[in-house]
Amino acid sequence: MEGGAAACPEKGIIMQTLVIGFPRIGTLRELKFASEKYFRGEIGAQELLQTAAQLRKIHWSTQRNAGIDYISSNDFSFYDMTLDTAVLLNIIPKRYKELELSGLDTYFAMARGYQGASGDVKALAMKKWFNTNYHYIVPEVEDDTVIQLSGNKLVDEYAEAKALGIETKPVVIGAYTMLRLCRFTGKKPALDYVEDIISAYQNLVKKCEENQIAWVQFDEPSLVLDMDDSDKALFHQIYDELLAVETDTKVLLQTYFGDIR
């Protein structure tokens, strides 16, 4: 868990605080054990979702009680935030959709694979997250993938915290980093999807405004990697168009693991 605060008494400036990456598994590994029970068929989806909601409540309350100024939401995940963002953007390969499972089980099929009455598919590949020991699920973009805003996880978890009297800023992996993390399995290169992903993030910001969300945080750790002129041009294109949207919701750009190149 990272975060911090600093003050400069001479100038009367007090810096505000946030946490980058609050642990989601639970102090007693509640998420791990509940998920394993679900996979074994010992509990249903509703009980798993209740465990998740209880953990989110604890995590938000812990930060509020610690005096954190900008508490995050949408940082909870059953498996991986990259996979969460892929689902949010409708980046779901056809072989998983064809299983015709529930949204939750389709998500887990992408993360763990699925062998059952509906079919037999392997999980998506995993890679090291920016050379750390954490591994993320690699999203697959097919030629007929339509990248667009899909699902309500982000606003639902914001509303969940709001109902507890806790104001939050939703967090999502940013568009530039998502393009860098995806694997493009067809003939189309990443650049063919730039306008679609910009449109999806524009709609995300608009949806935040519709739900009276003051801040949304985009995580862009790919900015700490070496960037050539084309990379820099792509980043500027994405954010020039994204920030051109007239909205009351403010965008917080977050990086980690190093300095912006």
Regions found by a protein language model. Name each.
Residues M1-G3, N133:
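Hydrophobic residues within membrane-embedded alpha helices
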Residues G3-G4, G12:
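Residue-identity detector for glycine
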Residues K11-R261:
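Domain-level signal for soluble alpha/beta catalytic cores
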